[in-house]
Amino acid sequence: MKHLPEQDAQVFKAIQLERKRQQDKIELIASENFVSEAVMEAQGSVLTNKYAEGYPGKRYYGGCEHVDVVEDIARDRAKEIFGAEYVNVQPHSGAQANMAVYFTILEHGDTVLGMNLSHGGHLTHGSPVNFSGVQYNFVEYGVDKETQHIDYQDVLEKAREHKPKLIVAGASAYPRQIDFKKFREIADEVGAYFMVDMAHIAGLVAVGLHPNPVPYADFVTTTTHKTLRGPRGGMILCREEFGKKIDKSIFPGIQGGPLMHVISAKAVSFGEVLNGDFKTYAQNVIDNAKQLAETLLSEDIQLVSGGTDNHLVLIDLRSLGITGKIAENVLDEIGITVNKNAIPYDPEKPFVTSGVRVGTAAVTSRGFDQEAMKEVGSIIALALKHHEDEAKLEEAKKRVSDLTARFPLYNELDY
């Protein structure tokens, strides 16, 4: 960085400290990743200066001929990756992508069937503290109490009983594959639209390592970060027949000008997905998650559903006698970043929880392999089992430092 250190030392210092935190700690928050330098360069480009309300070829501002090219590249690449008929890359976030779909097909008070937040769903799938739960009549489905897999019979029975206008599949803390075909069949039986929020698994879907919802769903929403390893943002994929309505819901419906610098970064990251190396990366993400799960289980740490099919693992802490809030703080002290997370049928409050969610997308981008994940799992088990033993925690902290030193991050950055 050339100008920021002199112009704004306070902000520069905070950025430096965050850079150091990312280097010195093991990032296991399942919704985070490390983008490439090329993605960061695109996002920090002169495109941040350009207003471009509207869509390519139909803008409300002049001078959009070059940003039109960028947005078309992003849309075309997304279509190619996911086999979608229509794509909108303008949503600023996954939440706004979901909002746009709801505004396209729902009226205030319509019934929607979505996954219970504490069972792995998302705030925008009907939580009463979110706009979705305020605007619409959400009915919740969840996971089976024994298997902790989605209870498709429960989904079917609730769909038959409540006749929702929309069924939402997808999750923020569900470690198993989702059967989109079953959801489609249920939606067809009751005459509902079907939407999939694939924010967490989009990178796995992109290269065929998780079933693709696009052939089954009327609408698919996603973030562009997480396993897709792009900039923070959202995207909607849908059938051609809904394309113009979706566009109108985004602009002028819920957004004004698109963030063209972010859309350029989306285009770059989609280009990276189309590179053959991305499939190897995504497979390593899954392999690392499975190795982490296996190591934790071998240490008698309980996992929701007993393991994982994707990038995330949900740890059930009840047998250890600690809460998610305590575990998050303990792990942060030794240099491992996670988030407390509710588990199915959780007796604790949302800000306390009985679980923590961990994911392998970021550490895999950093180069961690399965041997490294064995060590990570061993360190987590040590810290959680001995969370009040300062000597054990110091040992764990040293092992974290040894690991992070082996896998440097962003070597070419000059700050």
From Swiss-Prot:
Which of the residues bear the PTM N6-(pyridoxal phosphate)lysine?
226
Keyword field contains Amino-acid biosynthesis: yes
Question: Which reaction(s) are listed as its catalytic activity?
Answer: (6R)-5,10-methylene-5,6,7,8-tetrahydrofolate + glycine + H2O = (6S)-5,6,7,8-tetrahydrofolate + L-serine
Does the keyword field hold ATP-binding? no
Origin: domain of life:
Bacteria
S-S bonds: none
User: Which residues are noted in the entry as (6S)-5,6,7,8-tetrahydrofolate-binding?
Assistant: 117, 121-123, 241
| SUPFAM superfamilies according to UniProt | PLP-dependent transferases (SSF53383)
Subunit-structure text? Homodimer.
Q: What does the function comment of this entry state? A: Catalyzes the reversible interconversion of serine and glycine with tetrahydrofolate (THF) serving as the one-carbon carrier. This reaction serves as the major source of one-carbon groups required for the biosynthesis of purines, thymidylate, methionine, and other important biomolecules. Also exhibits THF-independent aldolase activity toward beta-hydroxyamino acids, producing glycine and aldehydes, via a retro-aldol mechanism.
Enumerate the NCBIfam families for this protein.
PRK00011.1 (NF000586)
The entry's family comment says: Belongs to the SHMT family.
* Name of the protein in question: Serine hydroxymethyltransferase
Gene name linked to the record: glyA
